[in-house]
Structure formats: C-alpha cells, structure tokens
Amino acid sequence: MKFFVLFLCLVQLWGCHSTPVVLGLEERNPACDDPETEAAALAGVDYLNQHVRWGYKHVLNQIDKVRVWPRRPSGEVYELEFDTLETTCHALDITPLANCSVRTVTQHAVEGDCDMHVLKQDGQFSVVFAKCESTPDSREDVRKVCPQCPLLTPVNNTKVVHAANAALAAFNAQNNGSHFELLEISRAQLVPLPVSTYVEFAVVATDCAAADGTDPACSGPPKKQYGFCKATVAEKLGGEEVSVTCTVFPTQPVAPLPQPDAASSANPPPAADPAVSPPSSPSVPVDSVALGPKRVLLPPPVHREHYNLRYSFPDVDSASGEAFGPRQKPKVTHPGVASGVGPVPPPPCPGRIRHFKI
C-alpha cells in the first residue's frame, strides 16, 4: 500500500514538470514608442507632477529604456527611463498639463531624467518606485542659439530677492482683496539690456485684507489660495520701475498627497523657501512616510538656479512589499524551456523626441 501511495506521488510530480510552460512569465522588452509603454510613462509623469512641491510641472519628452517584468500573483511592472521638459506652468497651477507650454531653449530650458517602476494591474497603472533629477540646459548651448538671451541666476541673489519683494509689494498695493505673502522664488534671470531683473515667484493668501498686510496676525494659516507672479524690475536713474502680473488660482481644498500603492502620508501645504520667506512665518512640516523607516522630504538647497526634481520624492520605496529599488530586479520565476531560437534583437529604443533634446 505504501508503495502504491509513493507511486501516485511520483506520477503527480512528473505531471507537474511535464506541464507546458505558461506564457507571459518572462521579461518583455517592448518598443519605447509602443502605446502601452507610453501609457505607463505618462502615468509616471502624472505621478511626478502630483509630487512636485516647488518649481514647475513637467511633460514627457522621450522614453529611453523599458523592460517589463511579471509580478506575482498578478500584473506586470514597467521599468522605465524617460526624459521630461519643464513647462511654464507652476506646480500649484491648476491648468491641465496638456495646456501648459514647454519652456523654450531661449528661455533656458530645464530637462528632467526619471527612473520609475510602474505597475499595471487590472488595466490600471500605479507607480511603485520613482526617482528623478533635473538640470538646466548648459550655458554654452543657450549661447549658441541665442547669444544675448539672459541665463538662469540663483534665486537667492540679492537683486532677485529684492525684485521679488518689490514686485509683491506693488501687487499688494494694487490688490483690493487678500494680502499675499511670498511663498517661493521659482526662477530668475538678470537681463543685460535694458538692465533689469526678471523673476517668477509663487505667493499665498493670508487671512487679512491687502490694506492690513502689515498686521503680524496676517500670517496665520490656513493658506489655501495660491498665486503665481511674473515681474520685471528695471533699473532707472534715481530709482527703479516695477512691472508685475499675478495670476491667483481658485481656492482649493487641501487634499492628501498620493503615495505609491496608497501609502498614507501627511500633506501640509508647500513649504516656503527659507531663503525668501518672512522671518515671522512658521516652519512648515514636510511629508513623512507613515510606514517603515521614517524619512523626510528634504527642501531644495538655498543656492540654486532651479528646483531639482530630486527633491520631489522622499528617499523611500513604496510601502508595498512588491516595491523594489532602481537597480534591483523583482523576483521572477523564469521557465526552464527556451522561449525562442537564437538571440532576438532588441526593439527600437530610445523612442521619439516629442519636443526637443537638450
């Protein structure tokens, strides 16, 4: 009897090994311009823009690499490398990304470089790992295209800080509504001719009227209405001329900032730039991940020409157990049977350039 039971076990074991290989359990290398690859990359760009706390929104420019891994028990993960370009829409602007203009080379463009892992499950995309950096175009390349165009200058430059404060004071003097205070200086350029300072900055409304802006109590939270200003402060004999235009965004309810795989986190309003914020304003807490080791989202450095995308994400992976680092492959069981005869040439990558390359 024992021999018969053992024989049945061996038969079942042999049957398991002789089962045909199930397709779809191996790594795939789709084309960078494949519609599904682009959909995964666009999901990554949306995730990026949801987490940008300073500076500007970004758009997809080019997909450099893609690998697709199966994920047990279901779904698959797109391992992506793609480039982005900075737009003229501020991170707090509610304008749809499709309506945002890409910053041109003559405006000193900024390029982003992202590594993301995007999970596709039940037809839905979600980001499980994200890492991005961004750099402005080189000064030499800008000069080749436009020798006289002004270049980016550090936002803590004394002329830049003065221009932002002077422009904000002029806006508050003309504004009959709420008093606004400086939230961040987003970018700046020193213009040689005519001698002037161009600055773009974000503002936030206080609970006081513009006429009462000098009252210390006017700095109290909550601050739910933001605006974005563009200003030029021209140097004149015996003084200066200030030109400023501000767009005030509709009041938005404070919503929780999404995290990969629905990991919960606190969501305070964007933190003010410590280099330009009023001394009396309270420090704003930054995001912290609720699960696992506590790691915070560090503010960008004070001396900078742009807001690097590296400060958009906390230094932590997804709270999901399926998340993995940028160079760590997910655990995959590869079949023991060859899937094809001979080496298969990789599909075309990188993909097309949607705007321009810098």
Swiss-Prot record:
<feature type="disulfide bond">
    <location>
        <begin position="146"/>
        <end position="149"/>
    </location>
</feature>
<dbReference type="Pfam" id="PF00031">
    <property type="entry name" value="Cystatin"/>
</dbReference>
<feature type="region of interest" description="Disordered">
    <location>
        <begin position="257"/>
        <end position="288"/>
    </location>
</feature>
<feature type="disulfide bond">
    <location>
        <begin position="229"/>
        <end position="246"/>
    </location>
</feature>
<dbReference type="InterPro" id="IPR001363">
    <property type="entry name" value="Prot_inh_fetuin_CS"/>
</dbReference>
<dbReference type="GO" id="GO:0072562">
    <property type="term" value="C:blood microparticle"/>
</dbReference>
<feature type="disulfide bond">
    <location>
        <begin position="208"/>
        <end position="218"/>
    </location>
</feature>
<feature type="modified residue" description="Phosphothreonine">
    <location>
        <position position="135"/>
    </location>
</feature>
<dbReference type="GO" id="GO:0004869">
    <property type="term" value="F:cysteine-type endopeptidase inhibitor activity"/>
</dbReference>
<dbReference type="InterPro" id="IPR050735">
    <property type="entry name" value="Kininogen_Fetuin_HRG"/>
</dbReference>
<feature type="domain" description="Cystatin fetuin-A-type 2">
    <location>
        <begin position="144"/>
        <end position="254"/>
    </location>
</feature>
<dbReference type="GO" id="GO:0050766">
    <property type="term" value="P:positive regulation of phagocytosis"/>
</dbReference>
<feature type="modified residue" description="Phosphoserine">
    <location>
        <position position="134"/>
    </location>
</feature>
<feature type="glycosylation site" description="N-linked (GlcNAc...) asparagine">
    <location>
        <position position="176"/>
    </location>
</feature>
<dbReference type="GO" id="GO:0005794">
    <property type="term" value="C:Golgi apparatus"/>
</dbReference>
<dbReference type="InterPro" id="IPR046350">
    <property type="entry name" value="Cystatin_sf"/>
</dbReference>
<feature type="modified residue" description="Phosphoserine">
    <location>
        <position position="320"/>
    </location>
</feature>
<protein>
    <recommendedName>
        <fullName>Alpha-2-HS-glycoprotein</fullName>
    </recommendedName>
</protein>
<feature type="disulfide bond">
    <location>
        <begin position="32"/>
        <end position="349"/>
    </location>
</feature>
<keyword id="KW-0677">Repeat</keyword>
<feature type="modified residue" description="Phosphoserine">
    <location>
        <position position="138"/>
    </location>
</feature>
<feature type="region of interest" description="Disordered">
    <location>
        <begin position="320"/>
        <end position="350"/>
    </location>
</feature>
<comment type="similarity">
    <text>Belongs to the fetuin family.</text>
</comment>
<keyword id="KW-1015">Disulfide bond</keyword>
<keyword id="KW-0964">Secreted</keyword>
<feature type="signal peptide">
    <location>
        <begin position="1"/>
        <end position="18"/>
    </location>
</feature>
<feature type="compositionally biased region" description="Pro residues">
    <location>
        <begin position="267"/>
        <end position="282"/>
    </location>
</feature>
<dbReference type="GO" id="GO:0001503">
    <property type="term" value="P:ossification"/>
</dbReference>
<dbReference type="GO" id="GO:0031012">
    <property type="term" value="C:extracellular matrix"/>
</dbReference>
<keyword id="KW-0646">Protease inhibitor</keyword>
<keyword id="KW-0732">Signal</keyword>
<dbReference type="InterPro" id="IPR025760">
    <property type="entry name" value="Cystatin_Fetuin_A"/>
</dbReference>
<feature type="glycosylation site" description="N-linked (GlcNAc...) asparagine">
    <location>
        <position position="99"/>
    </location>
</feature>
<dbReference type="GO" id="GO:0050727">
    <property type="term" value="P:regulation of inflammatory response"/>
</dbReference>
<feature type="glycosylation site" description="N-linked (GlcNAc...) asparagine">
    <location>
        <position position="156"/>
    </location>
</feature>
<feature type="domain" description="Cystatin fetuin-A-type 1">
    <location>
        <begin position="27"/>
        <end position="133"/>
    </location>
</feature>
<dbReference type="GO" id="GO:0006953">
    <property type="term" value="P:acute-phase response"/>
</dbReference>
<keyword id="KW-0597">Phosphoprotein</keyword>
<feature type="disulfide bond">
    <location>
        <begin position="114"/>
        <end position="132"/>
    </location>
</feature>
<dbReference type="InterPro" id="IPR000010">
    <property type="entry name" value="Cystatin_dom"/>
</dbReference>
<keyword id="KW-0325">Glycoprotein</keyword>
<feature type="modified residue" description="Phosphoserine">
    <location>
        <position position="318"/>
    </location>
</feature>
